[in-house]
């Protein structure tokens, strides 16, 4: 089977979020399972041609390889992509994003023909590639080269929909009749994500629970009705993590490598964090870590609301990340008030991220919603116990630990309010104080695996269903 991945960001070339990790790792996992894979993405200014061995094919396209045989094509345009930033700058989103990604979608399909790569599946990701299913359904339908191609459309985060004024619809190269309720129209505006959902052959998202949630009004994103109308074609497939990058036994970023059989290194990493953040060296106080974007989605409002209760507990808490200025200020204020217990590192630092995963006892992830989440999987890999709200991928990967039967791998609260959150933190601190119980929990954490190979097998089954035309 031959599959083309079309994405606006792909690791290691360009990244703003988790979609880039998926579009870098999943193609390699599919290749290892015998599939022929190509990747198409924009040729942004920040991509280093020399570093990645990128060669020019023609005026609009360059190429390189990753893995053993995954061919990567870069769509070039001197105006659209020769600028800093993928989607915007410090002033906000680029005003021509609709034109930029319309061009990318159209050129991606043209490149397939130019390099004579007749694929079986075109796998599209988020609103930036949402025009591709519509192009294959309408203007290119009569072209024999494209006629048999099927589309899979993955929604990584329903909150980002690609909404533009209706006056820009003529720029899409689509019949005006597609600007309708059953098409791209959304409250008298263009909604690209909606079009991708409607015109693709299959829709996936990044966890089973999130696939259920986006079909309800719970997330208030406005597309629940559209998704319910295609419910038989919507599938949740959990993302994986790279077990070579996130490996406590061989991680070059941490102070001391460790494993479940030789756990002492974990305590050395904890001591390093305590010294670095000028905490008292208290082995009996659990150290909670947070790595992520400082935003509403990640539950920072709830943490701020509960900070006085948390500040009175015997614990330590480290925040690592960047985000909205509002949360920068709130978290710095918390760290100032509880300087012996709370610290903040307001930048994304790869080494420090690995250190927080490795040296923390528990990992704080009270997200309001979380399509998949990778941090909880990474923390388990390092024997660091997640504390999460039951939503999206967190619900699919973390279950409450029961000391009676030894089941579960974290601490979960199911009602999104201060009291439930504080109760979960108290339960985690109490469990940590019981060394026998917590040791058992850490041992269980090391046993969980979320590999890309497992995810890739599910995608192959989905591609095969798509090609067989069986719903």
Indicate residue ranges for each PLM-predicted region.
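Catalytic cores of nucleotide-sugar-dependent glycosyltransferases that transfer UDP/GDP/TDP-activated
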Residues: 1-471
């Amino acid at each position: 089977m031959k599959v083309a991945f079309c994405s606006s960001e792909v690791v290691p070339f360009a990244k703003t979020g988790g979609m880039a990790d998926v579009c870098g790792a999943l193609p390699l996992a599919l290749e290892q399972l015998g599939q022929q894979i190509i990747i198409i993405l924009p040729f942004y200014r920040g991509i280093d041609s020399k570093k990645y061995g990128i060669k020019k094919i023609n005026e609009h396209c360059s190429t390189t390889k990753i893995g053993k045989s995954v061919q990567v094509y870069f769509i070039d345009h001197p105006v659209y992509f020769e600028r800093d930033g993928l989607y915007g700058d410090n002033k906000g989103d680029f005003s021509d994003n609709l034109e930029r990604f319309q061009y990318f979608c159209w050129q991606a399909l043209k490149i397939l023909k130019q390099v004579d790569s007749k694929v079986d599946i075109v796998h599209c990701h988020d609103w930036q590639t949402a025009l591709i299913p519509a192009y294959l359904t309408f203007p290119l339908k009569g072209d024999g080269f494209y006629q048999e191609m099927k589309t899979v459309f993955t929604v990584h985060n329903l909150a980002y929909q690609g909404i533009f004024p209706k006056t820009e619809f003529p720029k899409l190269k689509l019949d005006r009749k597609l600007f309708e309720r059953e098409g791209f129209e959304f409250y008298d505006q263009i909604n690209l994500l909606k079009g991708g959902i409607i015109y693709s052959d299959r829709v996936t998202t990044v966890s089973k629970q999130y696939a259920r949630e986006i079909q309800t009004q719970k997330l208030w994103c406005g597309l629940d009705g559209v998704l319910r109308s295609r419910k038989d074609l919507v599938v949740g497939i959990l993302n994986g993590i790279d077990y070579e990058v996130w490996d406590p036994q061989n991680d070059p970023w941490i102070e001391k490598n460790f494993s479940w059989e030789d756990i002492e290194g974990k305590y050395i990493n904890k001591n390093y964090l305590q010294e670095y953040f000028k905490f008292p060296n208290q082995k009996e106080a659990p150290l909670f870590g947070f790595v992520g974007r400082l935003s509403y989605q990640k539950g920072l409002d709830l943490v701020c609301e509960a900070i006085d209760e948390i500040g009175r507990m015997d614990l330590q808490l480290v925040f690592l990340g960047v985000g909205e200025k509002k949360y920068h200020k709130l978290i710095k204020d918390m760290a100032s008030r509880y300087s012996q217990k709370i610290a903040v590192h307001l930048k994304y630092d790869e080494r420090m991220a690995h250190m927080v995963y490795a040296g923390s006892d528990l990992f704080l992830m009270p997200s309001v919603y979380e399509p998949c989440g990778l941090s909880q999987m990474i923390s388990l890999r390092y024997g660091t116990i997640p504390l999460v709200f039951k939503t999206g991928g967190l619900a699919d990967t973390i279950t409450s630990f029961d000391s009676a039967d030894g089941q579960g791998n974290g601490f979960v609260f199911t009602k999104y309010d201060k009291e439930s959150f504080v109760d979960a933190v108290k339960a985690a601190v109490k469990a940590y104080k019981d060394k026998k119980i917590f040791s058992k929990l850490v041992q269980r954490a090391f046993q969980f695996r979320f590999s890309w190979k497992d995810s890739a097998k599910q995608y192959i089954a989905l591609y095969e269903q798509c090609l067989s035309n069986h719903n």
